[in-house]
Amino acid sequence: IMTEYAHSRTGIDIHPGADIGSYFFIDHGTGVVVGETTKIGDHVKLYQGVTLGALSPRGGHHVTGKRHPTVENGATIYSGASIFGGRTVIGENSVVGGNAFLTTSVQPNTRVVIRAPETSFKNA
């Protein structure tokens, strides 16, 4: 009941089973989702719209064990990033840029940047 109340008031959905370290910080938290088996280290920062979720099993099979990612100490994950899977680890002091989509691990001290295609404007 408390989880649903907190979600309705903040727009942040953190499963009560998530393992969260000290000094966890969410800035502009609307749309943040943290799954049940997520492990978050100390001094981690998340920004709006970040999802730490599970990959969907094939064929509707139920998956047991760790299904959500691990975020190690000192990592920062920027707006709109989606990180999925129980084997996915965001290494210590890494930075995941906005709108990244990850299903594989990131080594410690890595910067993940998504480069958008060029945007052009033409007169009508």
Task: Enumerate the language-model features and the residues they cover.
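Terminal amphipathic alpha-helical/low-complexity segments used for targeting or macromolecular assembly
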Residues: 1-10, 124
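Left-handed beta-helix
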Residues: 10, 15-16, 21-22, 27-36, ...
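Regulatory activation segment
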Residues: 60-68
